């Protein structure tokens, strides 16, 4: 072996098999891919456990909240005036329902089907 100026324990890259390098890179890639998949799976499981609890707390807070806030949200969602969403509307429901069932012929028929 010719003296190249390096110490005797040094091996040149020419001696290393190219196939072994590719195997090492594939192994590192597979390990990283499995690690990322496990992390994504863990995050999905944590979200699946967190979301129902969040919804439960939100709905419980909603049920315990003031009726004023419920009326505001209802008026926003249904696009009815805020004044028409109060308890008077609930009290008048029976009267309105009876007036439509007594005289259904007075309702105009548009001929459309849902």
Curated annotation (Swiss-Prot):
This is Putative movement protein. Belongs to the nanovirus movement protein family. GO terms for cellular component: host cell plasma membrane; membrane. May transport viral genome to neighboring plant cells directly through plasmosdesmata, without any budding. The movement protein allows efficient cell to cell propagation, by bypassing the host cell wall barrier. GO terms for biological process: transport of virus in host, cell to cell. Keywords: Host cell membrane, Host membrane, Membrane, Transmembrane, Transmembrane helix, Transport, Viral movement protein. It comes from the Viruses. Residues 86-97 have a biased composition (Basic and acidic residues). The keyword Transmembrane applies. It is found in: Host cell membrane. The chain crosses the membrane at residues 27-47. Its main location: host cell. The gene is DNA-M. It comes from Faba bean necrotic yellows virus (isolate Syrian SV292-88). The keyword Transmembrane helix applies. It is a single-pass membrane protein. Residues 79-114 are annotated as: Disordered. Residues 98-114 have a biased composition (Polar residues).
